[in-house]
UniProtKB/Swiss-Prot annotation:
Signal peptide positions on this chain: 1-22
Single GO BP term: transmembrane transport
Subcellular location: Periplasm
Gene name of the encoded protein: fbpA
Coiled-coil positions: none
InterPro entries cross-referenced by the UniProt entry: Ferric-bd (IPR026045), SBP (IPR006059), SBP_1_CS (IPR006061)
Record family assignment: Belongs to the bacterial solute-binding protein 1 family.
Protein name, per record: Major ferric iron-binding protein
GO cellular component, one term: periplasmic space
Organism annotation: Neisseria meningitidis serogroup B (strain ATCC BAA-335 / MC58)
Chief location category: periplasm
Superkingdom assignment: Bacteria
Residues engaged in binding Fe cation: 31, 79, 217-218
One function term, GO molecular function aspect: metal ion binding
Task of the protein: This protein may be a central component in the iron-acquisition system.
Amino acid sequence: MKTSIRYALLAAALTAATPALADITVYNGQHKEAAQAVADAFTRATGIKVKLNSAKGDQLAGQIKEEGSRSPADVFYSEQIPALATLSAANLLEPLPASTINETRGKGVPVAAKKDWVALSGRSRVVVYDTRKLSEKDLEKSVLNYATPKWKNRIGYAPTSGAFLEQVVAIVKLKGEAAALKWLKGLKEYGKPYAKNSVALQAVENGEIDAALINNYYWHAFAREKGVQNVHTRLNFVRHRDPGALVTYSGAAVLKSSQNKDEAKKFVAFLASKEGQRALTAVRAEYPLNPHVVSTFNLEPIAKLEAPQVSATTVSEKEHATRLLEQAGMK
């Protein structure tokens, strides 16, 4: 009996000496379904619970800046890199271990100058088109050519999309400011704006317009749900290092103000790991950046996209693109 009591007391002492893992709060600007899938996988692997506070990335970045050191967030998970760059410029992010950053480092993948955020997945800008009206040979070799009278009331776009804004940045970098403004004014005059990429896709599927500029994963999700044989649309990849072939990136960071930095860093490391990337790409047709992971969706190989090696990674680039949208009358 005495021996049993000693073992019980020893077990209790060891339990008390082991610090409990803290739950973490993630400000989530990524699509909620994807973030929830990764959060659930992380909790199963570590026992650490994750609370998601989901909203648009720009909105959350602004909220974090306003909250400052009082922010309850431990991690910021963003669908776009510019939102992370905003917080990095404000010195609100914690440096990450090289082991985490190196998990997804690759050709063309943006890297934080301060090593305080990590890129996690990519999405390709594409042209979705109605196969009842068009074939591949009818489509343009450059995204710039869709902002012309030929495509009047035939081409759709989502000007409030973060990826659309990043595409403007790419045009500025590759073709110059004048070309970017001309493109925006052309789309404004000849194209049809939609509130979301998914709405633009549905407009093409319904035959309302002939084509639209969207991100690849909207079509892949739609085709998986309906069955690819049952949809009237297909994707066209512009290639040729054109701005229309742009790949945009999601990423994550740990906040300096976090009271649970160890757990937060474990979560970001998990996002970049094979296990985390598999959880993400099982539910969403984004390109995993960890080279050891292959998507469950039938994606065009990222090496064949011939994407331009540019990305929006600074606050000033994003602000410049926003001003161009204003000049074109889109905002």
